[in-house]
C-alpha cells in the first residue's frame, strides 16, 4: 500500500505541477478571451482609425515643422524683405476683415430699416387733423390724454421750420456761405426738437409723468406748427404789434395744448408746475429768439433802403437859406464890380 501510495505521490507531483501550469495558462487564456469577448469588430476598426489618425497627425506635424524651417531659412535669407512681406500680408488680411465687417454692418442696417416703418406709417388726413388739434387745448385733464406715437408729422414740421429759417436769413441779408446757412438752420431746428424733448422727458421721469420719449418727440414736434405759422408771417410782414399778437395767440395755443397734455399725465401740483412751467418757458422763448435773431439786421436794411426817418423836405429847407444867401452875395458883388468899371 505504501509502495503504491508512494508511486501515486511520485506520479502526482509532476502532474500537480503540470496542473498548476495548466491552471495558470488557462487563467491567462480566460482573461484574454474575456477581453476578446468584450471587444467587438467595431472596436478593432476604432483602433485602426486611431492608428490612422495618429499617423496623419504625425505627418501634419512633420509638414508644419518643415514649413517653419523653410520659413526660417527664407526669412533669414531675405532678412527685412521677408519681414515686410509678412507684415504686408497681415495688414492686407486685417483690411479685408475690416471691410467685410463694415459691409456686413451696412447690410444689416439696410435690412433693419423696416424697424422704423411703424413710426412713419401715417395717412395725410391724420397728419392734417393732428396739425389742427395742436392749436386746440384739451379741457379734460382728469385722465391721460392720448398722444400720437409717430414721427412723420413732427419731422416734416422741423424741416418746414428749417426752410422758414433759411428764408429769414436770406431776407435779413446774412452774408454767409450757403452750407453754413443750411447747417445753422438744421442745427437750430433739430437741436431744439431733440434737446428740449430729451430735457422735458428727463423732468417727466423725475416727476413720475406717464409719457414716453416717442410721445414727447411727437408732442413737441406738433407744437412747432404754431412757430412755423408765426415766423412765416412775421418774416414777410415786419410789424412788431402783429408779431406780439400772433406770439400770444398762436404760440400760446400750441403751448397750452402741450401743457394740458402733460398736466393730464402728471400727478401732484408741484411736479405739474415744474414740468409745465419749464416747457412753456422754453417753447415761448424759443419763438422770441427765432424772431429777434435777425430783426435788427432787417431794420438796418430797411433804414438803408428807405433812408432815415427825417423827412427830406426839412433837410432841403435847412439847406435853402445858405444857398440863397450865397447867390445874393455873388450877385451883389458882380453888380458892384460892373458899376465901378462904368464909373472909371
Curated annotation (Swiss-Prot):
It is a multi-pass membrane protein. Keywords: Cell membrane, Cytoplasm, Differentiation, Glycoprotein, Golgi apparatus, Membrane, Transmembrane, Transmembrane helix. It comes from the Eukaryota. Residues 1-12 have a biased composition (Polar residues). GO terms for biological process: cell differentiation. The keyword Cytoplasm applies. Residues 1-146, 207-212, 264-272 are cytoplasmic. The chain crosses the membrane at residues 147-167, 186-206, 213-233, 243-263, 273-293. Residues 1-24 are annotated as: Disordered. The keyword Transmembrane applies. GO terms for cellular component: Golgi apparatus; plasma membrane. Glycans are attached at residue 329. It is found in: Cell membrane; Golgi apparatus, cis-Golgi network membrane; Cytoplasm. Residues 168-185, 234-242, 294-344 are lumenal. Involved in the maintenance of the Golgi structure. May play a role in hematopoiesis. PANTHER family: NATURAL KILLER CELL-SPECIFIC ANTIGEN KLIP1 (PTHR15627), PROTEIN YIPF3 (PTHR15627:SF14). Belongs to the YIP1 family. This is Protein YIPF3.
